[in-house]
């Protein structure tokens, strides 16, 4: 079994059930795993506190039974995947509205449709931004894609399972951003060390995707096209050559929004993008689920042949893959990225 989570995206569950030796009638295996109809929950028993928590929920979309091996294979995707199958079928117009309000309203809109209610709850803060959007009824845009497009410029989002009075509930959650910042003065902030509580790690860096001067292209054509330029001049001081690139945001017609969006992109790529993967057990400090989650920033320390003088970075958790051990200990693979740079619009 394996299940994943990704920041502002959709994680996946894959698992196999051996039907040999179990009472499949009493367990209602066939009717209880119907694709497109059934929600699958993953419950984690925390060995530190002996409490149980829902750590993953999603829709079963595929199943396959192999009679030779008597094995049922199940594939599910996080609850956000359901909203890929929900369409904006009425024209919706938002003028100078908080983008977090727009996102929540779109979710509530589709939940209010006939047979659309899933019992979703909401944790949606206000932001300091505003946006103007029109979703035309003839486009039939998916609700998920509309929310994801909003998030690219303004916020993080997820559907998070939790317990409420003993009931399993899903909550649509927006963060500005999601996650808890690392603090050296907070003893609960997660620290990962190799050697130490990290079993292994991968450290790829992609210079081909780096840019320290980025041109943003917005709405319009020819001389009337909106443009902006974002620069991280600190990289030149650090010895990097000029690395230029351009990005297209043809649906952005506001100069301030184009400036902010281009700058955000630059800050993510001005240092060669680094996607670190670390493999850790669930049973050592920091403990799985209770001590770190998607969106958190954590400290990573490495001292080995590749970093003989030691490396100490603050990285953000953007992905998580959990492999519960069947014949060995549980393992968690965290995907982490560098903190954003501090460029400027010129």
Role assignments for model-derived ranges:
Residues 5-24, 71-82, 216, 270-284, ...:
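Oligomerization/assembly interface segments of phage tail-like spikes and tubes
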Residues 6, 13-15, 76, 91-121, ...:
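Amphipathic, non-transmembrane alpha-helical segments in extracytoplasmic/periplasmic proteins
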Residues 20, 63-65, 77-81, 177, ...:
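Solvent-exposed coil/turn segments that connect beta secondary-structure elements
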Residues 24-123, 339, 343:
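Surface-exposed cap/loop segments at beta↔alpha junctions
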Residues 55, 59-83, 120-210:
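Short beta-strand-centered interaction patches in the first periplasmic/extracellular domains
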Residues 63-68, 320-327:
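Short, conserved beta-turn/loop elements at beta-strand boundaries and strand-helix junctions
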Residues 145-148, 178-325, 341-345:
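Acidic, small/polar-enriched beta strand-loop surface segments
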């Amino acid at each position: 079994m394996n299940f994943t989570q990704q920041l502002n995206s959709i994680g996946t569950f894959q698992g196999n059930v051996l039907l040999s030796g179990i009472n499949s009638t009493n367990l209602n295996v066939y009717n209880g795993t119907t694709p497109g109809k059934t929600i699958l929950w993953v419950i984690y028993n925390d060995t530190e506190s002996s409490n149980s928590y829902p750590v993953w929920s999603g829709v079963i979309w595929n199943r396959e039974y192999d009679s030779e091996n008597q094995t049922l294979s199940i594939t599910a995707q996080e609850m956000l995947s359901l909203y890929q199958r929900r369409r904006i079928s009425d024209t919706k117009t938002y003028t100078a509205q908080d983008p977090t309000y727009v996102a929540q309203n779109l979710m509530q809109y589709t939940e209010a449709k006939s047979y659309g209610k899933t019992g979703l709850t909401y944790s949606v803060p206000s932001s300091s931004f505003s946006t103007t959007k029109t979703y035309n009824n003839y486009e039939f845009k998916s609700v998920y894609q509309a929310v994801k497009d909003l998030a690219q410029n303004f916020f993080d989002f997820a559907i998070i399972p939790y317990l409420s009075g003993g009931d399993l509930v899903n909550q649509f959650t927006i963060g500005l951003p999601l996650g808890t910042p690392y603090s050296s003065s907070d003893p609960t902030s997660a620290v990962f060390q190799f050697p130490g509580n990290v079993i292994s790690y991968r450290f790829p860096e992609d210079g081909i995707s780096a840019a320290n001067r980025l041109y943003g292209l917005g709405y319009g054509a020819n001389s009337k096209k909106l443009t902006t330029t974002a620069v991280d001049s600190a990289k030149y001081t650090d010895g990097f050559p000029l690395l230029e690139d351009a990005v297209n945001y043809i649906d952005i017609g506001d100069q301030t929004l184009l400036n902010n969006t281009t700058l955000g992109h630059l800050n993510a790529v001005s240092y060669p993008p680094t996607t670190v993967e670390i493999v850790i057990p669930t049973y050592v400090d920091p403990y799985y689920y209770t001590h770190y989650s998607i969106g958190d920033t954590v400290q990573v320390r490495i001292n080995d042949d590749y970093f003989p003088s030691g490396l100490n970075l603050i990285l953000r958790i953007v992905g998580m893959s959990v492999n519960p051990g069947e014949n060995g200990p549980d393992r968690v693979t965290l995907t982490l990225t560098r903190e954003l740079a501090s460029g400027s619009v010129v």
